[in-house]
Amino acid sequence: MGLEIERKFLLKNSDWEKWINQKTSIKQGYLNSDIERTVRVRTTDKVALITIKGKTENTSRQEFEYEIPFEDAESLLKLCETPLIEKTRFIIKYQGRVWEIDKFEGENEGLLIAEIELAREDEEVVLPSWIGEEVSHDARFYNSALIKNPFKNWK
């Protein structure tokens, strides 16, 4: 069993772009997007994964993630709720920490979210100047919620 502890933030500006170390294209869908549990299928440039996540409590939840054959993932994505989530993930190494910046495309174009994974819920994080409002506890920003209420519909 794994435990995922992460915090999510909006971005204030584009200063983060000068810190990019890596980028990856991601396509993902949800076989189940219930608030109590999600079952996600994800393909990246290199791998395919199936992930089961439990309900979020504060900033943590149980997470089980397994690599699966790419062809299986492509077939499973056809069974997922729509729209699929499409995004580019940028890896930022900043002051000894790894940040993931997701730039959403398609139905969620215009949305940018920064995430940082932690070892403990009470772990202190020094926020870079480009980090804006924290949205860790706002369910609208869960990827599984973005398939039901895409960002383009928020306006």
Which role does the model predict for each range below?
Residues 1-155:
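Phosphate-end processing signature that detects enzymes handling 5′-triphosphorylated RNA
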